[in-house]
Design a protein with these regions (language model features):
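A glycine-/small-polar-enriched, mobile loop at the entrance of the PLP active site in fold-type I
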Residues: 6-62, 66
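Buried hydrophobic positions in well-ordered alpha/beta secondary-structure cores of metabolic enzymes
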Residues: 13, 25-26, 65, 99, ...
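Active-site C-terminal subdomain of aminotransferase-like
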Residues: 16-17, 193-279, 283
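Conserved beta-loop-alpha segment that forms the PLP phosphate-binding cup at the N-terminus of a helix
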Residues: 55-84, 88, 92-96
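Active-site phosphate-binding strand-loop segment of PLP-dependent enzymes
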Residues: 117-174
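Conserved active-site segment immediately N-terminal to the catalytic lysine
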Residues: 181-193
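Conserved PLP-binding catalytic core of the aspartate aminotransferase-like
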Residues: 287-318
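PLP-dependent enzyme catalytic core of the Aspartate aminotransferase-like
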Residues: 329, 333-386
Length: 386
């Protein structure tokens, strides 16, 4: 038992928040039409450009990441146009749900949970369907931990000047290299509650000039998520409607830290946490679920006879550690550990120790301490390589 109760969040999101961000979010909200907030808003936009690695403007919306996904689709797909959807899990399936909701004709590349979509598959679909006008995909599929070859897929899409590439990078930003301008990514969607270390409530979209040309001629009705209306307002340091003021105040504090440490070091931190967790899991003889893993999430398959729900319950009730199970078709079959947010190796090491006990008491056969030793060895080697 924990005599002093303290919750530690190792889920894919929401994630542990930066204390300075929480402190700023608790300050009395600024007036969003006054100059002091406009100046703060512009500073946040400039900071986001550095995280996204883009010179294009980054719009800030008061909604979840799913709202950002919806905005990216309804503003770019005119009635009668066809989209290519790249689907590798539950959040890829959200592209399907959005397209079907708005009556958008679609071609779908769908792979089994745990797999990644290959650039050659995207190239083949574009060749077979020359009327495709946009490609929608995830950088990392949160439901499985799988990572797509974003750079390789972008290279195939860029062979078609008339096609835009829209990327859900909600768990990719800050955990995986995302080079928006260098790779030619037209719209990249982010969310505040992941590697940015602040509460939910803000979606961010970087938008290329090629994407803006499509948005300007898109005849699909939209209101709250009208990016043209937002672009006009945000050029003046404000949003079209009331923004998530407190979250933006917290986001400014988080960006101050991220830019001070360096965006690449934020990615390196996620790489370290993921590598340590996977070293332990492999030491226990368990299988990492996805064929190609990103750094945002580690998904693994417990031994036969070990109930993931019992492991999660013990982690929560006995240690105050929150981890996640599977989603969609993998519900009840895998466990997922998040590596984004405000935590470090010491916390990851403690989580591994707790997980060893929970797995053992749920029926797994493993040596207590073996995973921690594997994680420590990984940490030592990681430090030597930096």
């Amino acid at each position: 038992m924990n005599l002093i109760a303290k919750t530690r969040m190792f889920m894919p999101g929401p994630t542990p928040c930066l204390p300075e961000a929480i402190a700023q979010a608790l300050v009395t909200p600024m007036h969003h039409r006054k100059d002091d907030f406009k100046n703060l808003f512009r500073e946040v936009q400039a900071g986001l450009q550095q995280v996204f690695k883009t010179r294009s403007e980054v719009l800030i919306l008061a909604c979840s990441g799913s709202g950002g996904m919806e905005a990216s689709m309804v503003n770019t797909m005119a009635p009668g146009e066809k989209a290519l959807l790249v689907v590798a899990g539950k959040f890829g399936e959200r592209w399907i749900e959005l397209a079907d909701t708005f009556g958008i004709e679609r071609v779908t590349i769908q792979v089994p949970y745990g797999e990644s979509v290959e650039p050659a598959q995207v190239a083949a679909a574009l060749e077979a369907h020359p009327d495709i006008s946009a490609v929608f995909l995830q950088a990392t599929e949160t439901s499985t931990g799988a990572m797509n070859d974003l750079e390789g897929i972008a290279a195939q899409v860029r062979k078609r000047e008339d096609v835009i590439l829209v990327v859900d990078a909600i768990t990719g930003l800050g955990t995986t290299p995302i080079r928006t301008d260098e790779w030619g990514l037209d719209i990249v969607v982010g969310g505040s509650q992941k590697a940015f270390m602040v509460p939910p409530g803000v979606a961010m979209l970087s938008i290329s000039e090629r994407a803006w040309r499509r948005i300007e001629k898109c005849g699909r009705p939209r209101y709250y998520l009208d990016l043209l209306r937002e672009r006009k307002a945000q050029a003046q340091g404000q949003s079209a409607y009331t923004p998530a003021i407190s979250v933006i105040q917290g986001l400014k504090a988080a960006l101050d830290l991220i830019l001070k440490m360096g965006v690449d070091n934020l990615v390196a931190n996620a790489t370290l946490q993921a590598g340590a967790a996977r070293a332990a899991i492999k030491c226990w003889g368990m299988q990492i679920f996805p064929r190609v893993s990103g750094n945002a999430v580690t998904a693994f398959i417990p031994p036969t006879g070990v109930d993931p729900s019992k492991v999660m319950k013990m982690m929560r009730d006995r240690f105050g550690v929150l981890i996640s199970g599977g989603q969609g078709s993998m519900k009840g079959k895998i466990l997922r550990i998040g590596h984004l947010g405000y935590f470090d190796f010491l916390e990851t090491l403690g989580m591994i120790g707790c997980l060893e006990i929970a797995l053992t008491e749920a029926g797994a056969e493993l040596e207590i301490g073996s995973g921690c030793r594997a994680a420590l060895e990984y940490y030592r080697e990681f430090g030597r390589s930096q």
